Amino acid sequence: MDSAFHEALASGIEALGLPVDEAARALLERYADRLLAWNRKVNLTAITAPAELAEKHLVDSLVLLPFLTGAGTLLDVGSGAGLPGIPLACARRDLSVTCCDGVAKKIAFVKAVSAELDLPVRGVAVRAEGEPEREGLPRADAVVSRALAEPDRWVPVGARYLAEGGTLFAMLGREVDRAGLEAAGAAEGLTLVGLDVYELPVSHAARAVARWQQR
């Protein structure tokens, strides 16, 4: 990877105060390298500039780290090329991650790169529709969607995969109405416990993370 990638990754991690050690950074670089290599043959991401990939895929995935203290399992729904699940596994190698997506070629990449990097990540080629037993998906301490669907569509599905005491996350490309998030959670017996708004440090793109827990 080029110097622009390293600078974007380091500046993003430092600006947002994320707990990412040198070993994790090395894994993140290897993941990004394999992602771009596979992307030449398989459509995994529209972002191909290394610095932009570092910020908008890696750093933006890692923002969940401070909220995962105590979580042992994570389910990444609509994971695509393993985002945010694989970057989180790079930084939290004690975290058992399941990435699911309905597109088999994307999960083939997830499986291959996770094996190559020796990450605790399982890939499942299935579209999550709220039926974990039928789909072969676990209930997890943290259930995550990254811009998969609007919150009122995501929460009823994601709630089905929560382990007892777990947290449901929605990673959003913008700030949304808090009242709408509260209503979406309440309909599923969940309480909105956080809405954190942040800005990516290089592009200044606005982002938000919503968190719900069982009542």
UniProtKB/Swiss-Prot annotation:
Chief location bin: cytoplasm
Reaction(s) catalysed by this chain's protein: guanosine(527) in 16S rRNA + S-adenosyl-L-methionine = N(7)-methylguanosine(527) in 16S rRNA + S-adenosyl-L-homocysteine
UniProt cross-references to Pfam families, sorted A to Z: GidB (PF02527)
An MF annotation (GO) of this entry: rRNA (guanine-N7-)-methyltransferase activity
Keywords annotated in UniProt: Cytoplasm, Methyltransferase, rRNA processing, S-adenosyl-L-methionine, Transferase
EC number(s) stated in the UniProt entry for this protein: 2.1.1.170
CDD domains xref list: AdoMet_MTases (cd02440)
Recorded superkingdom: Bacteria
UniProt-annotated location(s): Cytoplasm
InterPro entries named in the record: rRNA_ssu_MeTfrase_G, SAM-dependent_MTases_sf
Keyword Methyltransferase: yes
GO CC terms of this entry: cytosol
Binding site for S-adenosyl-L-methionine: G78, L83, A128, E129, R146
Reported function: Specifically methylates the N7 position of guanine in position 527 of 16S rRNA.
NCBIfam families (UniProt xref): rsmG_gidB
Entry's family note: Belongs to the methyltransferase superfamily. RNA methyltransferase RsmG family.
Name the UniProt record assigns to this protein: Ribosomal RNA small subunit methyltransferase G
Lineage: Bacteria, Pseudomonadati, Myxococcota, Myxococcia, Myxococcales
